Curated annotation (Swiss-Prot):
This is Proline--tRNA ligase. InterPro entries: aa-tRNA-synt_IIb, aa-tRNA-synth_II, aa-tRNA-synth_II/BPL/LPL, Anticodon-bd, Anticodon-bd_dom_sf, Pro-tRNA-ligase_IIa, Pro-tRNA-synth_IIa_bac-type, Pro-tRNA-Synthase_IIa_type1. The keyword Methyltransferase does not apply. GO terms for cellular component: cytosol. Gene3D superfamilies: Anticodon-binding domain (3.40.50.800), Bira Bifunctional Protein, Domain 2 (3.30.930.10). One of its GO terms (molecular function) is ATP binding. Homodimer. The keyword Protein biosynthesis applies. One of its GO terms (biological process) is prolyl-tRNA aminoacylation.
Amino acid sequence: MKQSMVFSPTLREVPADAEIKSHQLLLRAGFMRQNASGIYSFLPLGLKVLHKVEHIIREEMERAGAVELLMPALQAAELWQESGRWYSYGSELMRMKDRNDREFALGATHEEVITDLVRDEIKSYKKLPLTLYQIQTKFRDEQRPRFGLLRGREFLMKDAYSFHATQESLDEVYDRLFQAYSNIFARCGLNFRAVIADSGAMGGKDTHEFMVLSDVGEDTIAYSDTSDYAANIEMAPVVATYTKSDEAEKALEKVATPDQKAIEEVSAFLNIEPSQCIKTMVFKVDEKFVVVLVRGDHEVNDVKVKNVYGASVVELASYEEVRSLLNCEVGSLGPIGIAEDVEVIADHAVAAIVNGCCGANEEGFHYVNVNSERDFKVNQYADLRFIQEGDQSPDGKGTIRFARGIEVGHVFKLGTRYSEAMNATFLDENGKTKPLIMGCYGIGVSRTVAAIAEQFNDENGLVWPKAVAPFHVHVIPVNMKSDVQREVAENIYTSLQEQGYEVLLDDRTERAGVKFADADLFGLPVRVTVGKKADEGIVEVKVRATNESAEVKVEDLHTYIADILK
C-alpha cells in the first residue's frame, strides 16, 4: 500500500488525556481516534492490527473445534431477567427502551442470548458437545473510562460458549481452549501468565485469567518465587497458621484516643503494632449487613467475603448505613457490644490476637486488652484477607511476590448456572431431562491490541511483533523527486509484495526527518531506506525492534529480509 493513500494522521505531541504509553502511541501514530469518552474509531493502520489479532484468534479457535457465528449486540431485557442478571449486573449494563416501551440492553456479554439460542435447537445428548464463538462489539457503561482501549465503553471481544452432557466433556474442552488461548497470546508475542481467577458477575466456579505483564495493569498477580503458582490477588488463599502467644489475658480497658481513627494513627498513639489492632468493617452482602474483622496490618478481600456467603453482590456499607446499624462513626468501629442479630465474621488471624485493640463504637475511644470470644462473639472464622508479599505460596512452594497485569482473556466453567435459570435442557442417553453444562471463554480483542502496544514500544514509537504488524516492511525513498530513488523504491515495493510480504511505501514528498519520525511511530518490523546510494544499488535496512541497521545490495534484499522475518 502507498502511504499517500493511507489515512494515518500522526501527532508530534502527546495528547494531554493519554496517561499510558499504549494510549499515547496509538493516538500519536494515527492508529485510532477518540469519538467520546471510552469510545474510539480504528483508523486504517489500527484496523489492520486488529484484523491480524482476529485472524490468529480464528485460526486457534477453529483448530480447537469451535465454530463461528454472530449474535446481536442489542438484547431483549426478558432474557437477562430470566437469568436473574438484569438487576444484579449493575449500572455497567447499558439499558434502553424502544418506541413501544420494551426494554433492551446493549450486550456486555452474551450468555443469555447463546443459552436462548441453543435451548431451542439442542435437545439430545447426540448433538453434544458443541462449541460456538463470535467476535462482536460489546458495551459497558464504565464509570471512569481510562487508559484508551484498556478500559473503554465500547470494545471488540471474542466470546465462545461450549455446551456439554457431562462434566468430563466440559473439562476436556476447557483444557483445549485454555491451550488455544495460550497459543493465541504467544503468537501475538505477548509476555503473559495464566492465573487462577474469580468468576465475578459471570457465575460458575473454575476459572482462569490470562494476564499480560505490565506495570500499568489494573490487576495484581500473586505468584510463587519458586513454582509456577499464579493467581489473581483476589483469589489467592492464605495458608498461614497463627498461634496465640502465651501472654496472660488482661482486663478489658476503655481508653481515650482523641482524633485517632486510622489503624496507623491509633497504633502509634497507643504505642502498639498495627498487627495488635482489630480492623472492623461493615459490608452489605446482597441485602444483609455483615461485620468483618481482620488484623490491623491486613486488608479485607471482598471477593472472599462474597464466596463465604455465595453472594451475588458485596459492597462496603455507606457511612449512613453504618451509623444506622451500629449507632457510631466508621473511625470508631469495633466488635464489642454489637447486637446479637448482627452477624460477625473474622479472619483466622484475629483469633490469635492476645490483648489487642479495637474501636469502642464511640467517637474518640478505643478498647485495649481485647480478646476474641471473651469480649466479643464471632459467628464464623474464614480466610478473609488479601494475601501479602512474603506470605507462603498456597502450593507450599516458595513465597509470594506481586506483579501487575492486564487481563486479556478469561475462561470459565459455568456449569449449569445459566441453563438451570433459563431451562436449557437435553435428554441424556437414558432419556432423562438434564440441564446443559456450559463453559464460557472470552478474549478482549481490542484490549489485546492495546496490551501488545503497551509491551512493545520505545521512546520513538511502537515496535510491533511481526505477527500483528500492519505491514512487514516500510520502504522509504528519502527524496521522491529523485527519479533513481523513486524507481528503486517502487521496484523494491513491487518485488517484496510478489514475495508475499505486506509492504508500505512512503511515496509522500515530505522531508526525510518527517518520514523517519512517522516510520518510528508506526513501528513496522523492517525499514528499507532508499537514499543517495540508490544509484549504486545499495539501500539501508533497519530492524525496528533492535534499531540495528546495515547497508544491503538490492539483489540481496529478499534474502536479508527473509532472514529477519523468519
